[in-house]
């Protein structure tokens, strides 16, 4: 049920643990900013059985913000892949290729407001972060928090439903061609900026509903 808490990359004590479920792989290497994007023996995952692959690295080997990918070998070929359970992916502004990103800020976000109270009859404002701004650009979590949330509260809504939050490479898909089911779309900002948006909404008495897409993917 909580596979996202096991697979992907996680900081466990003084170590980093990388895990993937890839039953058809013959070998998997982790490569990224921390090893010059090279396929090297020290970054080869261990086959733990049952399709589970794992690599444990010391905490000093990886830092917050590092980009990385898997390099997977299988019978008849090999290639780069993003972790199935990546929680943060970013797009290169030049090549437009996505990489996973280690996301572990030194300080966790500190919530300021309690959750908005449950209401029997929610009045829902449906919105898309990127298209909610008035400027001819993709709006961000910060833009939405500053400019849109106050308007939603003033109009009397008690719930906001946010569309297209999962990472998707094609912006024109409106978020319905999901590539990374466990990652917020980085084009809108950071996870902490999204938490600040939710926090501010709760402070205004507005509940937040995340429109999570399970039935569409890029494959």
What annotation goes with each model-predicted range?
Residues 1-17, 22, 38-39, 44-126, ...:
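The feature marks proteins involved in alpha-glucan
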Residues 28-30, 68:
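Short beta-strand elements bearing conserved aromatic residues within extracellular beta-rich modules
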Residues 31-33, 73:
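Predominantly extracellular/luminal cell-surface or secreted proteins
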Residues 90, 108, 112-119, 124, ...:
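Substrate-binding/active-site clefts of carbohydrate-active enzymes
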